[in-house]
Amino acid sequence: MIETLYNLPFHILVPPNIKVRRFSIPMPSPMAVFSVILFSYFLVTGGIIYDVIVEPPSLGATVDEHGHSRPVAFMPYRVNGQYIMEGLASSFLFTVGGLGFIIMDQTHTPGKTNLNRLLLTAMGFIFILVSFFTTWLFMRMKLPSYLQP
C-alpha cells in the first residue's frame, strides 16, 4: 500500500536521465593529518578558548619602585588566569615535549642505523627535558612558592 503511494509520483512525472559523478575527497596524507592534530593541540593547550571568552591582554604591566611601567609576560599568583603570550609560550613548550615523545617513538621503526637511533633518542630526550624544565620554570614564575618545602 505504502509502496504504491511512493511510486505514484514517478508514474506521473518522468525523472530525467542524468549521469551524476560520485563526489570523492582524496584521503589526506598521514603527515597532513598529524599536522592538523598537532596544530589543534597547540591551540587548545595555549588556551585559545579562554582567550576568546575572557579576552585577556597579550602582555601585562607592573609598576616598579621608580614609578616606571614594566611589561610582564606571566600573570603572577593566578593559576587559572593567563596573558595571551603566556599561553602561547606554554603551549609551544607542551608541543615541543610531545614532539620529543614522537621523535623517540621513531627510533623503533625498522631500517634505522644505530647512529640515527642514537641521534633520534638524544634529540627526543633533549626536547622532553627542555620542555619539562622550562614549563617547571614558568610555573615557578607564576607561583613563587611552588614546590617549596
Curated annotation (Swiss-Prot):
Protein's organism = Drosophila melanogaster (Fruit fly)
Q: Which InterPro entries match?
A: OligosaccharylTrfase_OST3/OST6, OSTC
The membrane topology noted for this protein in its Swiss-Prot or TrEMBL record is:
Multi-pass membrane protein
User: What protein name does the entry list?
Assistant: Putative oligosaccharyltransferase complex subunit CG9662
Which terms under GO biological process does the entry name? Answer: protein glycosylation
Record topology, Extracellular segments: 54-83, 139-149
- The UniProt entry lists the main location of this chain as membrane
Membrane-side (Cytoplasmic) residue stretches: 1-32, 105-117
Disulfide bond entries: none
